[in-house]
Design a protein with these regions (language model features):
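N-terminal and secondary-structure boundary signal
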Residues: 1-169
């Protein structure tokens, strides 16, 4: 029997608008309780923190996510690691949060966050967000299958971490 609490890694896609509309007193507390529950079970949570930075500079520790509430909440409230990809970064919290560090240059290919999570047989949690509203896991599958309608595009974004220049993507 597979239960979410048996997971070592959970990749979370979320949309908390409905939860926040129903829980007006302190909606963030519910999210914090959920994340702390998972961490206490030894689960590493990985969350999209996409900034879509295609030009200029991306600061791993400072650039805010444009992918909703959860990543920015985690970056404010938890000790986290964030991947260095300027468009499609991820934050991770928990025992094995370093899984998102030092990823490859491809957002969806070999040595991407998706690739690493796949190798770890991770669980996937769509929280209040239907799969029909999009999911980048599909892009990983497309890239590793070399579909003919996808192509690589490079952007000249400078990546910084802890005030140190890492590279240009």
């Amino acid at each position: 029997k597979k239960e979410i609490t048996n997971a070592k890694f959970i990749y979370i896609y979320s949309d908390f608008r409905k939860l926040f509309a129903e829980n007006k007193k302190n909606p963030e507390k519910s999210v914090e309780l959920l994340l702390n529950f998972l961490i206490k079970k030894g689960i590493t949570c990985v969350v999209p923190s996409f900034s879509y930075t295609t030009a200029g500079s991306f600061f791993v520790n400072k650039t805010k996510s444009k992918a909703g509430f959860l990543a920015n909440f985690i970056m404010k409230k938890f000790k986290y690691e964030r991947s260095e990809h300027p468009l499609f970064s991820y934050v991770a919290i928990g025992k094995n949060k370093k899984i998102v560090k030092n990823i490859g240059k491809s957002a969806f290919g070999i040595d991407s966050v998706h690739s690493r999570l796949f190798k770890k047989n991770s669980y996937f949690l769509n929280f209040c967000r239907p799969l029909s509203r999009g999911n980048t896991l599909v892009h990983h599958i497309e890239q590793i299958q070399s579909v003919n309608y996808r192509f690589d595009k490079k952007f000249k974004t400078k990546v910084f971490k802890n005030k140190r220049y890492l590279a240009s993507n």
